[in-house]
Curated annotation (Swiss-Prot):
Subcellular location: Cytoplasm
Record's protein name: 7-methyl-GTP pyrophosphatase
Chain ranges passing through the membrane: none
Group of enzyme by EC: hydrolase
Gene Ontology cellular component list: cytoplasm
Function noted in UniProt: Nucleoside triphosphate pyrophosphatase that hydrolyzes 7-methyl-GTP (m(7)GTP). May have a dual role in cell division arrest and in preventing the incorporation of modified nucleotides into cellular nucleic acids.
Organism listed in the record: Burkholderia mallei (strain ATCC 23344)
Marked site (Important for substrate specificity) residue numbers: Y19, Q80, E164
Record GO biological process: nucleotide metabolic process
EC number: 3.6.1.-
Active site as annotated: D79 (proton acceptor)
Amino acid sequence: MQHHACSPPRLILASSSRYRRELLERLRVPFDVVAPEIDETPLPDETPCATALRLAAAKARAAAERARAPHGALVIGSDQVATFDGLQIGKPGTHARALAQLQAMRGRDVEFHSALCLYDSRSGATQSEDIVTRVRFRTLTDVELDAYLRAETPYDVAGSAKSEGLGIALLDAIDSDDPTALVGLPLIALTRMLRAAGYPLFGAPAPAADGVNGR
């Protein structure tokens, strides 16, 4: 891919998630997908926010290395961690564990930390943010929960519910500053970061990049 001086930088999504890809497509910008390969194990005594932010940044940097973009790129990394009763909720992996998660959470509030990192491989600058979404689960029967799991098999999702699909029927309320955060790619935060990095979202030049933090 050729990049001229006046061309916007290459945009890379560091994720293999179809749902994150579909969200990014809403912005009508060209991008490539590079799946990062990292260890996602939480560190001892790490807070949910810290875990999500660390993994989002690690994914962005890992994808930047795999992409081998000679002219540099803006790389989007994201990660989501769910918490319930003060504990991190992992991806269930099996039907039995997913059912146990949903049984424990019915009628209760669950917090989702959706972390985002925009890494500029040209300068090494990063922008990071954690968007918190509070979700209340409906009180559903075991039969309903089992039927949902068999219909959508959300065993690779923290919290065992895909809000972008049938999983929305499990939820009673969602409280968030960014309606796309729960799906895993907070677009309000992302567009703010892209604009701060000087990326022309609307096809028109963005203001000169400034205020980009080094978190």
